[in-house]
């Protein structure tokens, strides 16, 4: 059965997921597609493994930006797709293949029928880590094309196709990675008194960290500490000299993030004293909260509700992390959820977004951009 042009693009991209700042094939695919548009009004810049594209307007007064993240995840795919990932251990499990496809569709529409204002498309690498939004924002390549307004989307498996969901103000949480390395003294399992067991130390640390949320964060605020991975030890009869905890911190307020980190550091110091070990904390990458510009978001929601076929839902804040928050710190704009109706959620090996959402998104975003970027 034949599929539409942009569904095929999505499937092509789905087959070649690549992790942060290694998206060479994805970058080339984007460049090759843009090359087919070959228009005198299109300018292209390459930034690391990303692509920045400008469509010059007929009578520009402002620059409207669309950001699409392009990277995949280190997940082994279990969708059963005929077009499943050909890169072992990697998958587009967060919908960035759809985000990119929608961006290319919107770009195509912009070239076909130019508007008054300039349009800039940011095909951004490394959203899943270590973070591409901030360095792209600060790059020389973007400096002269910096948008005055910027928008981004993220697929939402829980919402049906034909819907978007967003809200004014805070949409996504502050997030930070968390790594704790513990080093004690190894030894024989028969002589525990001669060793400092880092498996036991790690176990105590995990349970104590949960008290940070229940006893140190305002109940009217929200915060989550998740330890997703613990490693330590070599075999069953040797007391572990080292262990490592890996997780994330998520808070709705900047103040809570600071408070949570302070309490983590105090608890880790207590573990060091209790188990006579050494501990090193590394917070890795941190993403700023996604805070939607109130007036622009309100205007967008009203436009979509009244002038397109899409249904608009006012959602609540999510503990999701997104480095698009850095762009919204400097550029007025907004992000929204796009319904894709999948049984399985984001970062799941069986995530299967409904491809019907692609064409719907391209159509209504083209309507919005033409309305926003044309002199009345």
Swiss-Prot record:
Catalysed reaction equations from the record: N-acetyl-(2S,6S)-2,6-diaminopimelate + H2O = (2S,6S)-2,6-diaminopimelate + acetate
SUPFAM superfamilies: Bacterial exopeptidase dimerisation domain, Zn-dependent exopeptidases
Swiss-Prot/TrEMBL GO biological process terms: diaminopimelate biosynthetic process; lysine biosynthetic process via diaminopimelate
Molecular function as annotated in GO: N-acetyldiaminopimelate deacetylase activity
InterPro entries cross-referenced by the UniProt entry: AcetylDAP_deacetylase, Amidohydrolase, Bact_exopeptidase_dim_dom, Peptidase_M20, Peptidase_M20_dimer
Record pathway: Amino-acid biosynthesis; L-lysine biosynthesis via DAP pathway; LL-2,6-diaminopimelate from (S)-tetrahydrodipicolinate (acetylase route): step 3/3
NCBIfam families recorded: amidohydrolases
Function: Catalyzes the conversion of N-acetyl-diaminopimelate to diaminopimelate and acetate.
Name of the protein described by the UniProt record: N-acetyldiaminopimelate deacetylase
